[in-house]
From Swiss-Prot:
Keyword Ubl conjugation: yes
Tissue expression profile of the protein: Expressed at high levels in the heart, kidney, pancreas and placenta, and at lower levels in the brain, liver, lung and skeletal muscle.
Lineage: Eukaryota, Metazoa, Chordata, Craniata, Vertebrata
Signal peptide: none
Record GO cellular component, one term: nucleolus
GO BP, sorted A to Z: alternative mRNA splicing, via spliceosome; mRNA processing; mRNA splice site recognition; negative regulation of mRNA splicing, via spliceosome
Primary location class: nucleus
UniProt protein name: Serine/arginine-rich splicing factor 9
Low complexity: bias regions: 189-198
Amino acid sequence: MSGWADERGGEGDGRIYVGNLPTDVREKDLEDLFYKYGRIREIELKNRHGLVPFAFVRFEDPRDAEDAIYGRNGYDYGQCRLRVEFPRTYGGRGGWPRGGRNGPPTRRSDFRVLVSGLPPSGSWQDLKDHMREAGDVCYADVQKDGVGMVEYLRKEDMEYALRKLDDTKFRSHEGETSYIRVYPERSTSYGYSRSRSGSRGRDSPYQSRGSPHYFSPFRPY
């Protein structure tokens, strides 16, 4: 068996993932949702314009995190049904495993999408953060010309990404923004090749759309 272990990464440190939140959610709302399960150490809310917000909530006692998942997963909150679970991590220490010191995660999956239109400063970490709104990302990579690849642990998460994250606003760690396109791997012949099958798909219908426009707070393009 490889060094990968599909663990419930937050179980040991009291952290849980909360997804499918309403767009106007605040940290105070999350505190109100979870305070009864135990003392909360930290709330990290990810609320990007145009995307469904998600959050990480960390309890002082890991057992409280288990209770919160049991009590709030599938809970109807306004018009939203919450998704509450342990965040998945690998290798036993949390975080995302990497192919090299600064490389992308190395676990692979067949539930794969390609992304085009990334800004020049967009990294695989930025791509992973953006795309995990659809579910658990096990691999993310960025190549030249603003093209990236993302693999999900579950088929339904891949399908959700294709429906909901296509033509959404992406922001890099340097503040550059662009609108990205998300499409199935089979629809493209960008730089990625399928080494397991040795074949490539047809040309992407997005190749004819022209160069994407980037918006940078640092330099003009």
